A protein has these predicted regions:
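Protein kinase catalytic-loop region centered on the HRD/HxD motif
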Residues: 100-110
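Conserved HRD-motif arginine in the catalytic loop of eukaryotic-like protein kinases
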Residues: 238
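Activation-segment/catalytic-loop signature of the eukaryotic protein kinase fold
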Residues: 58
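AlphaC helix of the eukaryotic protein kinase fold
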Residues: 24-46
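Conserved short submotifs of the Hanks-type protein kinase catalytic core
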Residues: 62-76
């Protein structure tokens, strides 16, 4: 249950608009729902910044469990799926803002693990806000979902290959989900359908999606490069941080094009069979590193710019670029 509530001061004036979440606790309720609520109760108080709802209060399970948090006005990104494909400029803008928000969460030692349009909202100034942390994993907290359940946890269309293989600590899983979302907004189609079984989920380990440009000819080659890089099966072949993804979306001229940008059809039967064969019973070769360790491994690029003879306009543009880099 979710209710709109208000915090009122001693003068009777309402302050920050709030929502209260209360779990349904009845016989026959899905245990994952209850555990997920407990996970969110643990995680939300540890998060800060404009990309998450502000935490206000909570109640424990010994009396009445609840969470009170800031209410983000407006709608989620979910209704835009019904309008896909969107204009390319809008796809880029959405992707850049959401990638910036995802990177902010990763810097706070959190992997969301359920990035999808219904869990993304926007403030009035356009800042993306991520909500619903019931499936998330925080490096400094016990992973209750990993301890309690033996099935992959997530939303079928957006789950990364490693999530299907029970890996829950890799921030690059969120980049895969972002790639699914960008693909859908660009083409109007889901890259891997909407599977509802483990067998269906495992197909993404060996079957690659139809290249976006074959479904939408006006999709730029660089954007296809970005999307297909996010959707790589192996995390090592994706973007290593959401900040890198955001920067590429903000500055397409710097995107290095590979064979991904040129693809116009899916891989052939022989290549797909090889992938299927190697995926049989395969477990990911995965290091159990923390989110901060993964971010530290990512390359940092520094550029020196001669501004001795720069115009005022150029200096302002450089300042704006640096500001955006720092924010991401």
């Amino acid at each position: 249950h979710i209710w709109k509530v208000q915090e009122v001061n001693h003068q009777g004036d309402s302050r920050l608009p709030l929502v209260m979440k209360v779990p349904r606790i009845k016989g026959g309720e899905d245990p994952a729902t209850i555990v997920g609520f407990e996970v969110e109760m643990m995680i939300l108080p540890m998060l800060r910044g404009r990309h998450v709802p502000q935490f206000i209060a909570k109640g424990d399970f010994t009396r009445q469990p609840y969470i009170v948090m800031e209410r983000i006005e407006g709608h989620s990104l979910r209704p835009r799926l019904d309008e896909a494909p969107l204009a390319i400029d809008e796809v880029i803008e959405i992707g850049s803002r959401v990638a910036t928000a995802v990177h902010d969460l990763h810097r706070q030692n959190l992997v969301h693990l359920d990035i999808k349009p219904s869990n993304i909202m926007f403030r009035e100034d356009g800042t993306a806000v991520l909500v619903d942390f019931g499936l998330s994993r925080h490096d400094h907290l016990p992973d209750l979902l990993d301890e309690e359940f033996t099935l992959p946890m997530g939303t079928g269309p957006y789950m990364s290959p490693e999530q299907v293989q029970f890996v829950r600590n890799d921030p690059r899983s969120d980049l895969f989900a972002l790639g699914v979302m960008l693909y859908h907004f660009t083409t109007g189609e889901r890259p891997f359908g909407a599977p509802d079984s483990v067998r269906g989920l495992r197909r993404r380990l060996y079957i690659d999606p139809v290249p976006p440009r074959s479904l939408r000819p006006d999709c730029p080659a660089w954007l296809q490069e970005v999307i297909l890089r996010c959707l790589e099966v192996q995390p090592e072949r994706r973007y290593q941080t959401a900040a890198q993804l955001a920067l590429d979306l903000q500055d397409p001229g710097q995107v290095a094009l590979t064979r991904r940008a040129e693809k116009m059809q899916k891989s052939g039967a022989i290549k797909t069979f090889k992938r299927w064969f190697f995926a049989l019973g395969a477990e990911p070769a995965h290091e159990r590193m923390k989110v901060a360790e993964q971010l530290e491994r990512s390359p940092i690029i520094m550029a020196a710019v001669d501004i001795d003879h720069a115009t005022t306009a150029l200096l302002q543009q450089l300042q704006e670029t640096v500001r955006r880099i720092v924010l991401t």
